[in-house]
UniProtKB/Swiss-Prot annotation:
Function: Histone chaperone that facilitates histone deposition and histone exchange and removal during nucleosome assembly and disassembly.
Gene Ontology biological-process annotations: cellular response to stress; DNA replication-dependent chromatin assembly; nucleosome assembly; nucleosome disassembly; positive regulation of transcription elongation by RNA polymerase II; protein modification process; silent mating-type cassette heterochromatin formation; subtelomeric heterochromatin formation
Chief location: nucleus
Cell compartments where the protein resides: Nucleus
Lineage, broadest ranks: Eukaryota, Fungi, Dikarya, Ascomycota, Pezizomycotina
Keywords: Chaperone, Chromatin regulator, Coiled coil, Nucleus, Transcription, Transcription regulation
Compositional bias (Basic and acidic residues): 196-210
Coiled coil segments of this chain: 183-248
Organism from which the protein derives: Aspergillus oryzae (strain ATCC 42149 / RIB 40)
Gene3D superfamilies: Histone chaperone ASF1-like (2.60.40.1490)
Protein name per the record: Histone chaperone asf1
UniProt-listed PANTHER family: ANTI-SILENCING PROTEIN 1, HISTONE CHAPERONE ASF1
Region span, Disordered: 196-285
Length: 285
């Protein structure tokens, strides 16, 4: 756990002329009393290709540090143009704001800085020799890159572990990279097998469909012939039934005409039986 935590950084003059000093309002919190001072430092990266052109703009010792939230203004001079390659003056570069305790850096804040002319004409056609008075810097304050480091403070208990703990079982395990590659190879081989099986299934289904078409046609023809034969048989049966009904109909008429008196006698009996059958329903109500 860090004893000092950086809470915020505000850039006072931004954008500003290239030769104007840098001004930062820094807010930090101290959790316990410190025996030594904090060292703040601002570094200008003169070239992206080599650290040879990096230059320390200024450094400041702050202390003694009271416990709680603290705030101060850190001001640093502009970089020395003689130490910057002419081709690197314009364009994008980086400044680094760092803080150390007892020579041990525990926080670093990096900002992108864009150096460009204040005129569109000069930006479109920059002169061979840069006009420093017309160059303005713009710090991208909204997108800082903050890096924190674990360090030893005043007590030995606060010191971070210099070496990772012993893990003898880790030496027995296989290399993760080799296992990862083997898993990828297995997955790829399994995928190839699945695709091949799927293609074979599709081809076999196509052959089955081609062989099944004649059989289906034969079954349809058999069904049609069976249906026609059934229709013919049904028609012949219907004709025979019609003839039987006509003959039976004549006999029925003769019987009804001859037994008319018997049907009249049976009528009241049927009504009386119906009345008797309805009486239980009335009694229920």
């Amino acid at each position: 756990m860090s004893v000092v935590s950086l809470l915020g950084v505000k850039i006072q003059n931004n954008p500003a002329p290239f030769l104007a000093p840098y001004q930062f309002e820094i807010t930090f919190e101290c959790l316990e009393q410190l025996q030594k001072d904090l060292e703040w430092k601002l570094t200008y990266v003169g070239s992206a290709t080599s650290s040879e052109y990096d230059q320390e703009l200024d450094s400041l010792f702050v202390g003694p540090i009271p416990v709680g939230v603290n705030k101060f203004i850190f001001e640093a001079e502009a970089p020395d143009l003689k130490r910057i390659p002419t081709s690197e003056i314009l364009g994008v570069t980086v400044i680094l704001l760092t803080c150390s305790y007892d020579g041990r850096e525990f926080v670093r804040v990096g900002y992108y800085v864009n150096n460009e002319y204040d005129s569109e004409d000069l930006s479109a056609e920059p002169p061979a020799k840069p006009i420093i008075e017309r160059i303005r810097r713009n710090i991208l304050a909204e997108k800082p890159r903050v890096t924190r480091f674990a360090i030893k403070w005043d007590s030995e208990e606060s010191a971070p572990a210099e070496y990772p703990p012993d893990q003898p079982e880790a030496d027995i395990l296989e290399d993760d990279s080799a296992a990862y590659g083997a898993e990828e190879a297995e997955l790829e081989a399994a995928l190839v097998r699945e695709l091949a099986d799927a293609e074979r299934d599709v081809k076999s289904e196509d052959h089955e469909m081609e062989g099944a078409e004649p059989a289906i046609k034969e079954e349809e023809e058999e069904d049609i012939s069976d249906a026609e034969s059934e229709d013919i048989e049904d028609e012949s049966d219907d004709d025979e039934e019609d003839l039987d009904e006509e003959e039976a109909g004549d006999g029925d008429e003769d019987v009804e005409m001859g037994d008319d008196s018997e049907q009249k006698d049976d009528g009241p009996k049927a009504d009386s039986t119906n009345q008797h059958s309805h009486q239980p329903e009335v009694m229920v109500h």
